[in-house]
Design a protein with these regions (language model features):
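Terminal low-complexity tails and localization/encapsulation signals of metabolic enzymes
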Residues: 1-37, 70, 74, 124-147, ...
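Residue-level signal for inorganic ion chemistry
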Residues: 13, 32, 68, 90, ...
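Conserved C-terminal structural/oligomerization subdomain of aldehyde/semialdehyde dehydrogenase
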Residues: 31-37, 222, 357-358, 365-422
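Glycine-rich loop-to-alpha-helix module at the N-terminal edge of alpha/beta enzyme cores
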Residues: 33-122, 133
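Short, well-ordered beta-strand elements within core beta-sheets of diverse protein domains
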Residues: 35-41, 56-62, 147-148, 258-261, ...
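Structural signal for hydrophobic packing residues in well-ordered secondary-structure cores
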Residues: 57, 61, 76-83, 87, ...
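Rossmann-like NAD(P) dinucleotide-binding subdomain of oxidoreductase/dehydrogenase enzymes
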Residues: 125-268, 322, 395
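ALDH superfamily catalytic-core signature
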Residues: 224, 232-375, 398-399
């Protein structure tokens, strides 16, 4: 077990070890080894983080927006200087291939710079009143204290996605990283310290959703909750937030459909759909989760897609670069993928390639999978898979395809492949 990470809370500009005795193990999904363990933030420490964020917010909101933005640029500069280290950490604890992790780190720095520019665009309004000798002034003011609750699939970028808009608009924030990917968040908190961000403006706590996340969702002192993750967790957060009528901003799961019409460039569709399914081992909420194919081209498309998935390489991203994807995040994720694939098979679907976990390595890997003869009411079509699995459904015409695509409890994205947008 590595001692490289000694995760500590970052509260009021200081690092401190939690008094909690509950420890969480951080597992490398590529080989199932223990990277490190850390103490879950105690109830008292979470409450302290919220309190200092509350106390710091008034002064921070009065700081000129352009000055607030300058801290975002300093953080972005720090990210770029430490890019290689952040990439290494993300690959190690989350299982991304190196190129994807590098893109995430670079995207985070770019997003900070982009958000900093909004300091010049925080504007109010003067509205002419219906009453004489009166004008209406509209001011944009900060929400107050934001809690940012992060997912594990893009753990680094989502830090800045929560932090940057909050800070530039005069809010303070308490961030909880996923317990699966806390090391990159801890290293990020060190950047904040080096950038000189005022004490109490940004605070980091660590732990499970059922404990630390619940506190950040139920506190009366939190003015807004920003969460990215599963529908189930989002629903639980809404339940807690409703008790105080706290504003929530939720980005939840997805079941993105891809429609392949008869006039589509089949090779292009195969390439894009394959890439969109295996990116981050299929653990991306807005990438293809189900494919609808016109019956007239179904045989050709299915054959080419199956070959493309058979040629897809996976492996340990810590040691290999010639791979398309790495491991699933944990055993629970692997079990969910297996359960949905097995359910489809038992309901009459046909596994054309893959359909099982790779047992030849110690990591958590799942073979690239294509499943034909799926029906619209199957669980694998209706539920989020979050793995390198492509279920296929054939359709008669565009109206039926659109009906199928819209028959979902999820939102987010969709795609269509055609050479005739009319």
């Amino acid at each position: 077990m590595s001692d490289n990470y000694n995760i500590q809370n970052y509260i009021n500009g200081s690092f401190s070890v939690s008094a909690n005795t509950e420890e969480i193990k951080n597992i490398n999904p590529s080989d199932s080894s223990i990277i490190n363990s850390f103490k879950e933030t105690s109830i008292e420490d979470v409450e302290s983080a919220i309190d200092v964020a509350k106390k710091s917010q008034s002064k921070w909101s009065k700081t000129p927006a352009i000055e607030r933005a300058s801290y975002l640029k300093k953080i972005a500069e720090g990210i770029r200087k430490n890019e290689d280290e952040f990439v290494r950490i993300i690959v190690e604890e989350q299982g991304k291939i190196k190129d994807l992790a590098k893109g995430e780190v670079q995207g985070a720095a770019n997003y900070l710079d982009y958000t900093a520019e909004w300091a010049r665009r925080i504007e109010g309004e003067i509205v002419t009143s219906d009453s004489p000798d009166e004008n209406i002034f509209i001011f944009k003011i900060p929400m107050g204290v934001v809690s940012g609750i992060l997912p594990w699939n893009f753990p680094f970028f989502l830090i800045v996605r929560k932090l940057a808009p909050a800070l530039v608009t005069g809010n303070t924030i308490v961030i909880k990283a996923s317990e699966e990917t806390s090391n990159n968040a801890y290293m990020f908190s060190k950047l904040l310290d080096e950038a000189g961000v005022p004490k109490g403006v940004v605070n980091f706590v660590y732990g499970r959703g059922q404990t630390v996340g619940k506190l950040l969702s139920s506190s009366k002192k939190i003015d807004m909750i920003s969460f990215t993750g599963s529908v189930e967790t989002g629903s639980a957060i809404m339940t807690e937030a409703a008790k105080n009528i706290t504003k929530v901003n939720l980005e939840l799961g997805g079941k993105a459909p891809a429609l392949v019409l008869a006039d589509a460039d089949i090779d292009l569709a195969v390439s894009k759909i394959r890439d969109a399914r295996v990116i981050n081992s299929g653990q991306v909420c807005n990438c293809v989760e189900r494919v609808y194919i016109d019956k007239k081209i179904a045989d050709e498309f299915t054959e080419k897609l199956t070959k493309a998935m058979q040629n897809t390489k996976f492996g340990n991203p810590n040691t290999k670069t010639d791979i398309d994807y790495g491991p699933l995040i944990n055993e629970d994720g692997s079990k969910k993928v297996s359960e949905l694939v097995n359910s489809a098979k038992s309901s009459g679907a046909e596994i054309l390639t893959g359909g099982n976990r790779d047992d030849s390595s110690e990591g958590i890997y799942y073979h690239p999978t294509v499943i034909a003869n799926c029906k619209q009411d199957m669980r694998i079509i209706q539920e989020e898979i979050f793995g390198p699995v492509l279920p296929l459904v054939e359709f008669e015409d565009l109206d039926q395809a659109i009906e199928y695509a819209n028959d979902s409890d999820y939102g987010l994205t969709s795609s269509i492949f055609t050479n005739n947008l009319k």
